[in-house]
Amino acid sequence: MTEQKKRLEKLSGVKGMNDILPQDAGLWEFFETTVKSMLRSYGYQNIRTPIVEHTQLFTRGIGEVTDIVEKEMYSFTDALNGENLTMRPENTAAVVRASIEHNMLYDGPKRLWYIGPMFRHERPQRGRYRQFHQVGVEALGFAGPDTDAEIILMCQRLWDDLGLTGIKLEINSLGLAEERAKHRVELIAYLEKHMDVLDEDAKRRLYTNPLRVLDTKNPALQAVAQNAPKLIDFLGDESRAHFEGLQRILKANNIPFTINPRLVRGLDYYNLTVFEWVTDKLGAQGTVAAGGRYDPLIEQLGGKPTAACGWAMGIERILELLKEENLVPENEGCDVYVAHQGEAARDQAFIVAERLRDTGLDVILHCSPDGQASSFKSQMKRADASGAAFAVILGEDEIANGTAGVKALRDSSQSNGKSEQQTVPLEDLTEYLINAMVASTEDGDD
């Protein structure tokens, strides 16, 4: 290959790390606006943590024998100082680290939320990517089932706000450490009797993380898992009361749920409540949000013993659901497109555009693609393609008369069902367009 061909070779993105193009960004913005509004309504505050953390944060926090730590982390050694670093595969551990490092809980519990990209080194498929985005909440310093219920209710409110249906809630309790220890002994003994059915993954997990065997996707193993000793039968009075308290609040708020004894989650830091919101509309990747209580984690990462719970949801999966249910909002165009011809008109066009922007209108000012003067015909084609509601037209005649042409590009009461160009004095242009935009909005609401 010649040097010239090397220079001209087309480069592509990393597989499983996707571009979000302008035609898709509107859906992302719609979701982000909706979820941020919901989070504010519950009194949650935004926290932003770095994408790169020390690897030890995740090996200690998530657990060394989890799939994420064993197989899915993007880790590297910093050539500058030899530190072992990892691109965050999830954000709960990082939020907890930040809360400890900055002594955030000195004055009481905190309700926090985050949004951003996460990274896992796995085979890309529908709903699973190497770079993916999550929004999540962490309620730090709250011990009761009421907070577990609140974060579940937040999800239900978001589904309602987005118009999503058919997302079902599954819950379980993992109890306390001593209860899990008793169950672990019984579970291992049970699974050892079925070694002939266990696949390689199950055998690998049998003595390191046997709970994860219950979460198998292997049909041959599912019958074995179905009849395995259930952790819920090992719960003591405290754990049982916590779980029953959660159920009472959910029932009081008309949130339907199913108790799934095989729901264990893939991270080691969970205890007591765990839950997932699942759908059958995304194939195998049916979980759209998941979370639970992780009371041991803050102490595990060097803080004082502190209760905590939270959830995370995959944004790409939510957007897939919105598309599946035809809930994608139309991309909104700008309000005004300013067309012009001639130097004097161009100079005035800049002034007009800035004045309109001062009022809060979204304005595109025509700029020639090739540096040459564009005909009004070609400019109006661009104006129409931009999605603008109105075009402002400035030519030699308009500049000489101190006026502007205004053309409605969409049907509205302002255009009386027609699209004739109106002549408006420049000093009245801003007020005219504001009134026209209000009228067109009211027409759209009828």
From Swiss-Prot:
Keyword Nucleotide-binding: yes
Cellular component annotations (GO), alphabetically ordered: cytoplasm
Name used for this protein in its record: Histidine--tRNA ligase
Taxonomy of the source species: Bacteria, Pseudomonadati, Pseudomonadota, Betaproteobacteria, Burkholderiales
One family name in Pfam for this protein: HGTP_anticodon
Organism field: Paraburkholderia phymatum (strain DSM 17167 / CIP 108236 / LMG 21445 / STM815) (Burkholderia phymatum)
Main location: cytoplasm
Localization of this protein: Cytoplasm
Subunit text: Homodimer.
Gene name per UniProt: hisS
Any one biological process term the GO annotation gives: histidyl-tRNA aminoacylation
